[in-house]
From Swiss-Prot:
Gene it is expressed from: STAT5B
GO process annotations (BP): cell surface receptor signaling pathway via JAK-STAT; cellular response to epidermal growth factor stimulus; cellular response to growth factor stimulus; cytokine-mediated signaling pathway; defense response; development of secondary female sexual characteristics; development of secondary male sexual characteristics; female pregnancy
Protein name: Signal transducer and activator of transcription 5B
Membership in a protein family: Belongs to the transcription factor STAT family.
Residue list for modification Phosphoserine: S128
Signal peptide: none
Listed GO CC annotations: cytoplasm; cytosol; nucleus; RNA polymerase II transcription regulator complex
This protein's record includes keyword Ligase: no
Length: 787
């Protein structure tokens, strides 16, 4: 729920605290009318201490003013007139207030949002002990920002300590030079007479003794300062490493996991802006500490004092180098993944990004990134640091790209827009593994120079696994491999190991995610749908979903072994359902007009107590991507009727709505919705033409109509009449008397005597029409066929 909606429900002192956040600096009306826009901006991604971020802050200010002006323009009516003036005034006021200091607007809104979230969280503690996911994320982000503040303070502290050390050491060196000068004066005393020499010698000895005692004490102080500074750096690096682990091993890995699930249709992985701001802060603090450590080393070399400091500094220097190396190599990521089902000779794109490119000035010498395709085994060898140089599994065209720095967004990225896989070299397959189960990956590699070539890093990153196909017919099985990998890959795995078996509830989650994404629908798989799928997969009759919760599904069951009595796998059947829904039936699924996941017997059980003419649509058990109509009509012959399945090919000829509209004896959509109420908005209008209209060029226009001759005959016999199948008029359309071309009645039965259709013995009339139109015609019809 939006924070502002919850904030408006605050009461008592919490409400007063919330109201006190607003004033002339930021009116509460602006928060109210632009609540959605305000909460949708990445305020936390801006580093308030970085002057270069002024551009982003200015863009946010301009966006805020524009949104206010748009909101003002849309106000109408008497009340709207006053609001229009008020919002316009606020737009001008905010522009004038923050035009020269846009960072202050960011600081102000961040303060408001943080306190609103805190007040809402405190108010909800009694009703929501666990807290919402958004609250948990907000709390975690708050902790990260607090740690950054702590790191900033300790880094400033060591900077001050370093300056103190420098001043102390410089004064020590001056006094040490004074000691050397005194020693030189002793050598000159020989030239003086004995009395004067004795007097001067005594004074110089006292001065030298005093100075040497001071130098000895000060040397100990210097050594103590150095040790304390090194110890502080050790603590800073511990905190830095902990913070970096949270950001790289938790937050960034979670983003990558979301990116992987997005490949299965999950929600978008989200912006990288916040992550980049954190990584840039890490880079800045790491680099500051590294420079401090190097200066401390320089001081030790300038004035060597025996002790443990040299060893301590060498250790922290090695540690800070490891930390910055991990940061640079881990933040070289793939922002936009290449397609995971990759067809040869087909253009594809990808984008890689370095999250610390701006802060470490990598963009000053723009690096080039190279993309190559490698096998699963080569990826394993790469992660083991084995020599795999020039060991590739194919050839990619346009596989080199220079990284570009975008000043406005502060991003350093390389956009591969026109890559193409020219050829692929496959490895020997294991056992029953097919080519669509073989996984490859795109390797992106580059070389980054940091700190003016002070440090050079070889960086590599691997794409999500890709399956290479050479023909569209392989897409179905390749998608299954990708789905299984994306859903069940474990963090830190060896490329590209996945479990061979998963629990049924895990697969349900993956299927539902994929289904909603493919069909582009919020109507996902219900509990009843999942029971049906479990029955199909496990060949079981149990109707309780709980009975399947402990059952495992193997990869072989999913997409290697055919379903019992069928010539296709579970995934192939499920993918066919998604395909036909996506291409032709999406609005009907969203309307709830397709029951879909029921078998024939379940359909009959659902219809048995319904009035004649009640029908439902279910996915065919016998044909991939098929959908059939089951309806009730109690005749002498039978009570339930099942029409031969329609497929994508059929709906390319005539839509489902029009086919249902043709069959007037289908009256109610299960359970009791009038058919025309559900489907009439999808009927194709029939143009009205007068009966006397002349044919153009001697031709008359044909029209295709869905008919079921066997049912019409049976229903007519049952009614004792003599109606023919053409007496069954379609549902109301635009034209009251549509004209249909007459085709011979199909002599083959569409329905079996027992109510089951047989694909070998039945044929749909629409397909019959298509066959007739494809046969050789008399010479007078040939020109028309070509026109």
């Amino acid at each position: 729920m939006a924070v502002w909606i919850q904030a408006q429900q605050l009461q008592g002192d919490a409400l007063h605290q919330m109201q006190a956040l607003y004033g002339q600096h930021f009116p509460i009306e602006v928060r109210h009318y632009l609540s959605q826009w305000i909460e949708g901006q990445a305020w936390d991604s801006i580093d308030l201490d970085n002057p270069q971020e002024n551009i982003k802050a200015t863009q946010l200010l301009e966006g805020l003013v524009q949104e206010l002006q748009k909101k003002a323009e849309h106000q109408v009516g008497e009340d709207g007139f006053l609001l229009k003036i008020k919002l316009g005034h606020y737009a001008t006021q905010l522009q004038n207030t923050y035009d020269r200091c846009p960072m202050e607007l960011v600081r102000c809104i961040r303060h408001i949002l943080y306190n609103e979230q805190r007040l809402v969280r405190e108010a909800n503690n009694g009703t929501s002990p666990a807290g919402s996911l958004a609250d948990a994320m907000s709390q975690k982000h708050l902790q990260i920002n607090q740690t950054f503040e702590e790191l900033r303070l300790v880094t400033q502290d060591t900077e001050n300590e370093l300056k103190k050390l420098q001043q102390t050491q410089e004064y020590f060196i001056i006094q040490y030079q004074e000691s050397l000068r005194i020693q030189a004066q002793f050598a000159q005393l020989a030239q003086l007479n004995p009395q004067e020499r004795l007097s001067r010698e005594t004074a110089l000895q006292q001065k030298q003794l005093s100075l040497e005692a001071w130098l000895q004490r000060e040397a100990q102080t210097l050594q103590q300062y150095r040790v304390e500074l090194a110890e502080k750096h050790q603590k800073t690096l511990q905190l830095l490493r902990k913070q970096q682990t949270i950001i790289l091993d938790d937050e960034l890995i979670q983003w990558k996991r979301r990116q992987q699930l997005a490949g299965n249709g999950g929600p978008p992985e989200g912006s990288l802006d916040v992550l980049q701001s954190w990584c840039e802060k890490l880079a800045e603090i790491i680099w500051q500490n590294r420079q401090q450590i190097r200066r401390a080393e320089h001081f030790c070399q300038q004035l060597p004092i025996p002790g443990p400091v040299e060893e301590m500094l060498a250790e922290v220097n090695a540690t800070i180098t490891d930390i910055i190396s991990a940061l640079v190599t881990s933040t070289f990521i793939i922002e936009k993944q290449p397609p995971q089902v990759l067809k040869t000779q087909t253009k594809f794109a990808a984008t890689v990004r370095l999250l610390v490119g701006g802060k470490l000035n990598v963009h000053m010498n723009p690096p080039q990134v190279k993309a190559t395709i490698i096998s699963e085994q080569q990826a394993k060898s790469l992660l083991k640091n084995e020599n795999t140089r020039n060991d590739y599994s194919g050839e990619i065209l346009n596989n080199c790209c220079v990284m570009e720095y975008h000043q406005a967004t502060g991003t350093l990225s390389a956009h591969f827009r026109n890559m193409s896989l020219k050829r692929i070299k496959r490895s020997d397959r294991r056992g029953a593994e097919s080519v669509t189960e073989e996984k490859f990956t795109i390797l992106f590699e580059s070389q980054f120079s940091v700190g003016g070539n002070e440090l050079v890093f070889q960086v590599k990153t691997l794409s999500l696994p890709v399956v290479v196909i050479v023909h569209g017919s392989q897409d179905n099985n390749a998608t299954a491999t990708v789905l299984w990998d994306n859903a069940f890959a474990e963090p830190g795995r060896v490329p590209f190991a996945v479990p061979d078996k998963v629990l049924w509830p895990q697969l349900c989650e993956a299927l539902n995610m994929k289904f909603k994404a493919e069909v582009q629908s919020n109507r996902g798989l219900t509990k009843e749908n999942l029971v049906f799928l479990a029955q199909k997969l496990f060949n079981s009759s149990s109707s309780h979903l709980e009975d399947y919760n402990g059952m495992s599904v193997s990869w072989s069951q999913f997409n290697r072994e055919n379903l019992p009595g069928r010539n296709y796998t579970f995934w192939q059947w499920f993918d066919g359902v998604m395909e036909v829904l996506k291409k032709h039936l999406k609005p009907h699924w969203n309307d709830g007009a397709i029951l879909g996941f029921v078998n024939k017997q379940q359909a009959h059980d659902l219809l048995i107590n319904k009035p004649d003419g009640t029908f439902l649509l279910r996915f065919s058990d016998s044909e991939i991507g098929g959908i059939t109509i089951a309806w009730k009509f109690d005749s002498q012959e039978r009570m339930f009727w099942n029409l031969m399945p329609f497929t994508t090919r059929d709906f390319s000829i005539r839509s489902l709505a029009d086919r249902l509209g043709d069959l007037s004896y289908l009256i109610y959509v299960f359970p009791d919705r009038p058919k025309d109420e559900v489907y009439s908005k999808y009927y194709t209008p029939v143009p009205c033409e007068p009966a006397t209209a002349k044919a153009v060029d001697g031709y008359v226009k044909p029209q295709i109509k869905q008919v079921v001759p066997e049912f019409v005959s049976a229903s007519a016999d049952s009614a004792g009449g003599s109606a023919t199948y053409m007496d069954q008029a379609p549902s109301p359309a635009v034209c009251p008397q549509p004209h249909y071309n007459m085709y011979p009645q199909n002599p083959d039965p569409v329905l079996d005597n027992d109510g089951d259709f047989d694909l070998d013995d039945t044929i749909d009339v629409a397909r019959r029409v298509e066959e007739l139109l494809g046969r050789p015609m008399d010479s007078q019809w040939i020109p028309h066929a070509q026109s």
